[in-house]
Amino acid sequence: MLLVPTPVAWVEEACANTRILLIDHANCEKKAASTALALMFAYAEDLHLADKMSRLAREELRHYEQVVKLVRTLNITPQRLSPGRYADGLRRAVSRAEPQRELDLMICGAFIEARSCERFEVLAPAIAGPVGALFAALNAAEARHKKMYLDLARRVAMRADLEFTRRCAEFAAIEAQLVTEPDEIFRFHSGPPASAA
């Protein structure tokens, strides 16, 4: 699904900057829960989607609580962080017209979860101690969330006779560009640091 691996320069920055990594990861879990709730409101007539998103929102908030617990254990002071460009960069490609919009939102969700999963796989063995252990523990859930979003996307595509494979390929190209282009700020889904370019 993903066209490119996480750049080595990003992994090096993540290992050296676990404070920002954890704070932003907590933000990502909150955003994931918020997105699930927003989809429930946007497609209120779809009870199948509502069931999936309700469960997802609860699980993402439990993950948020796990991250915050570790933040407290490590005596990290929380701070407000500006959002990275990754999710917004993907969502700019989302259609405004239904039912294409719903398909795009599901595909977008799948790519975010897929990249999270890939980064957990890279970070878990690279960061010793409780941070790496947490990422290893969360990895299976991210893979499950990716599959759920893909299944929902296929369901929308079949119901509305939309092109699934082509649209996934278009988002894959955008996603690859977002994670390989240098970034001025370090975030969980950012590209490699601009200073490393």
Predicted region positions:
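Non-heme di-metal
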Residues: 1-197
